[in-house]
Amino acid sequence: MSKHLRITLVKSLIGVAEKHRRVVAGLGLRHTHHSVERLDTPEIRGMVNKVPYLLRWEELS
């Protein structure tokens, strides 16, 4: 079974750079406290690492 990440948007996007907004949208997050589960791939990890100050994430088995 492959690993998954649960990613939650914990900060508002007001005043955030447009590139960072696009990264958050690419993860599928729409509003504050919205969570999504994604496969743990290098691409998803890279997106999370671009905006760590906006997100909370945890590994799921």
Swiss-Prot record:
Source superkingdom: Bacteria
GO molecular function annotation: structural constituent of ribosome
Spans traversing the lipid bilayer: none
Disulfide bonds: none
Any one biological process term the GO annotation gives: translation
Gene Ontology terms: cellular component: cytosolic large ribosomal subunit
Pfam families: Ribosomal_L30
Annotated CDD domains: Ribosomal_L30
Protein keywords: Ribonucleoprotein, Ribosomal protein
Subunit organization: Part of the 50S ribosomal subunit.
Family membership: Belongs to the universal ribosomal protein uL30 family.
Record-given protein name: Large ribosomal subunit protein uL30
Species for this entry: Acidithiobacillus ferrooxidans (strain ATCC 23270 / DSM 14882 / CIP 104768 / NCIMB 8455)
Lineage: Bacteria, Pseudomonadati, Pseudomonadota, Acidithiobacillia, Acidithiobacillales
Gene: rpmD
